[in-house]
Amino acid sequence: RVIRLVLQWAAMYGDLLQEDDVAMAFLEEFYVSVSDDARMMVAFKEQLAELEKTVKQISEDAKAPQKKHKVLLQQFNTGDERAQKRQPIRGSDEVLFKVYCIDHTDTTIRVPVAASVKEVISAVADKLGSGEGLIIVKMNSGGEKVVLKPNDVSVFTTLTINGRLFACPREQFDSLTPLPEQEGPTTGTVGTFELMSSKDLAYQMTTYDWELFNCVLELELIYHTFGRHNFKKTTANLDLFLRRFNEIQFWVVTEICLCSQLSKRVQLLKKCIKIAAHCKEYKNLNSFFGIVMGLSNVAESRLALTWEKLPSKFKKFYAEFESLMDPSRNHKAYRLTAAKLEPPLIPFMPLLIKDMTFTHEGNKTFIDNLVNFEKMRMIANTARTVRYYRSQPFNPDAAQANKNHQDVRSYVRQLNVIDNQRTLSQMSHRLEPRRP
């Protein structure tokens, strides 16, 4: 049983074990121990051969040239990729990232994705020539600032969509201001994507979301729930997938609020509802809910003149979609819908995260100094759900888009959005001032 358990563990987390010296040492020591015992117990010999093959394969893979760390570009932008298959980000991969100073000048550092804030400070200090009293601050587009703790990890991927990292002495904290680029676009892209079919847009969104979702490691759910700093591991793939949901939401609101023409806004609403419908057909609940939540954003839902001119058929579709977001009875409407769908399925990840967090915070990890296995089983069930959703491959050739599919593909991977709710609300009021 122990040998079988170790083999299953190695099969499931082989790539991750290669990054862990302790795990690799354990596997090799375990193999030696089983080899010794197999001399006296014939029953071990068959499993020994399988164990030897597994340990040898993992060791060879760890030394292979393609397993060496990648260097990722700032903001992890993947919009320029072509047919290249997306690979999960590993903690040992390095990132080239800009860290800004109080005067908005920047310095580019190169550190591992899983680097702690302490390591980031050290890298910045090397570039600036002085690190005395430096702090690392993350700032969103609205100017909200948070001083990061020295042991915080995954600092690059946990930024908001238009968030940036700043380095400054503690006494200059109050003087930090957002960069102009953090405000987002000043013109919409309606002229570009109104020429693209709704089905093509939904298909390319689904292809990209599937790539992101497929890269999320189950262990990242555990790290996120129990605290990244407790494991000193990255949750980069999960962070990027969660950020994609927010990106879709704000994309919908941004495009509507940047459209000054009433008739064009009505067409945009119709287009977004059509895209949401196709995403639902593709079982892409991530983008589906992102679009629906974008449409229900207060900056958009208050545009009475725009909604009044929307055909009743589309109002009915939207009402049906919105009902699936009903949070009553623990999101029963969504759970029933998801339960009826077969894999491959891209889930509404924020709800799965909420389930795991609720389980973690509502149950003790230890009871009378013993592991609370009931809690672990509940958390494992959520992780198994993710595995089930990915148990069948998403076939990217199943619905190949038309001639301009490369343009559509590039567009959905490089969305430029305004993520400042105050700014969006102000724009909304300029479009349709409050009625007396």
UniProtKB/Swiss-Prot annotation:
| Ranges for domain Ras-GEF | 197-434
The N-terminal Ras-GEF domain, residue ranges: 1-59
Instruction: Write down the superkingdom of origin.
Output: Eukaryota
Q: Name one GO cellular component term.
A: axon
User: Which CDD domains does this UniProt record tie to the protein?
Assistant: RasGEF
Membrane topology qualifier: Peripheral membrane protein
> What keywords appear on the UniProt entry?
Cytoplasm, Exocytosis, Guanine-nucleotide releasing factor, Membrane
Kindly list the places in or outside the cell where this protein is found, as annotated in its UniProt entry.
Cytoplasm; Membrane
Its main localization is: cytoplasm
Gene Ontology biological-process annotations? adenylate cyclase-activating G protein-coupled receptor signaling pathway; adenylate cyclase-modulating G protein-coupled receptor signaling pathway; calcium-ion regulated exocytosis; cellular response to nerve growth factor stimulus; ganglion development; heart development; hormone secretion; insulin secretion
Quote the Pfam families the UniProt record gives: RasGEF
Q: Which InterPro entries match?
A: Ras-like_GEF, Ras-like_Gua-exchang_fac_N, Ras_G-nucl-exch_fac_CS, Ras_GEF_dom_sf, RASGEF_cat_dom, RASGEF_cat_dom_sf, Ubiquitin-like_domsf
Spell out the Gene3D superfamilies in the cross-references. Answer: Phosphatidylinositol 3-kinase Catalytic Subunit, Chain A, domain 1, Ras guanine-nucleotide exchange factors catalytic domain, Son of sevenless (SoS) protein Chain: S domain 1
Q: Which SMART domains match?
A: RasGEF (SM00147)
**GO: which molecular function terms?**
cAMP binding; guanyl-nucleotide exchange factor activity; protein-containing complex binding; protein-macromolecule adaptor activity; small GTPase binding
* Self-association and partners: Interacts with RIMS1 and RIMS2. Probably part of a complex with RIMS2 and GTP-activated RAB3A.
Q: What does this chain do?
A: Guanine nucleotide exchange factor (GEF) for RAP1A, RAP1B and RAP2A small GTPases that is activated by binding cAMP. Seems not to activate RAB3A. Involved in cAMP-dependent, PKA-independent exocytosis through interaction with RIMS2.
The protein, known as: Rap guanine nucleotide exchange factor 4
Taxonomic lineage is: Eukaryota, Metazoa, Chordata, Craniata, Vertebrata
